[in-house]
Amino acid sequence: MMILRLALAIVISTYATAQPASTSSLVTYIFGDSLTEVGNNNFLQYSLARADFPYYGVDFSGGKATGRFTNGRTIGDIISTKLGILSPPPYLSLSQNDDAFLSGINYASGGAGILNETGIYFIQRLTFNDQINCFKKTKEVIRAKIGDGAANKHVNDAMYFIGLGSNDYVNNFLQPFMADGQQYTHDEFVELLTSTLHNQLTTIYKLGARKVIFHGLGPLGCIPSQRVKSKTRMCLNRVNEWVLEFNSRTKKLLIDLNKRLPGAKFSFADTYPAVLDLINNPTHYGFKIANTSCCNVDTSVGGLCLPNSKMCKNRQDFVFWDAFHPSDSANQILADHLFSSLLSSSSPSPAPKPRQ
């Protein structure tokens, strides 16, 4: 957890000292999947990975679906509030005249993965490579606005949050109809993932990113969509072991990149222990149910909370909103944990705190 505290320390210190071209606020660029999406897929006409319908957003400001895959806020939304900045808007919602290019953008897309083939059955989504290309275009817009030198400094000073890899398992390797799960052993697959990620992170570095936080995977074997595969509805230990191997390999990758790339400050945020403790001990944090979701979903047809799904009455009792995504209340606990880890940096990282 020391790596997590280092990552968050970089965030706060950057927020306090960085001076981007047009604002003294922290500038953040976010890459990810449905855990951090804020509405990019709303603009993809044929995407099947969308959350722009009820009951998504029922607890968000205004009570309407925004494209966030939860009943309320993402962890990114909550952290942005704690940092005193607005949650960055979705890239596909912007025109080149928008000031958001200078204040932060969210490129995350539901269904996205590290590998291009991940989530292909969603028809449209922004893969990690697509998101990197969007960032490349963003830099071109910034350069046109403020000039080459200022643009380079701007992207060097910004913070980059990356959270990908979950779909490479849940919507690729673990799916019997996807080729990767049939073609590769897990050792081969995790090597493919991390070698691809190596190239992608190197590309982002060449585009100017220096302060990068990569969010490791949580215990995917314990999410509702995986538990239903067990006769006892218990966590799938094999899946969790694979996740831990991916996390370990990714940590080593980031350490290697920091050694080889001048000025790189790539950090790994290990949230696996905190999420697992929340799932294993829900009552300690004010929850009642962690083995199924608030929205009664059909995991055989995607596991999303559709308008005809049955929603639970007490949403605050559930760790999970749908078959894949945490509830607003769980996201609050996990976001609080990230900050409490930083504040207690002189001592071992504490477990998440219960709701007040």
Curated annotation (Swiss-Prot):
Its EC number is 3.1.1.-. The active site is at 34 (nucleophile), 322, 325. Residues 1-18 form the signal peptide. Glycans are attached at residues 116, 291. InterPro entries: GDSL (IPR001087), GDSL_esterase/lipase (IPR051238), SGNH_hydro_sf (IPR036514), SGNH_plant_lipase-like (IPR035669). GO terms for molecular function: hydrolase activity, acting on ester bonds. It comes from the Eukaryota. It is found in: Secreted. It is an enzyme of class 3 (hydrolase). Its main location: secreted. Pfam families: Lipase_GDSL. GO terms for biological process: lipid catabolic process. GO terms for cellular component: extracellular region. Keywords: Glycoprotein, Hydrolase, Lipid degradation, Lipid metabolism, Secreted, Signal. PANTHER family: GDSL-LIKE LIPASE/ACYLHYDROLASE-RELATED, OS02G0732800 PROTEIN. Belongs to the 'GDSL' lipolytic enzyme family. This is GDSL esterase/lipase At5g37690. It comes from Arabidopsis thaliana (Mouse-ear cress).
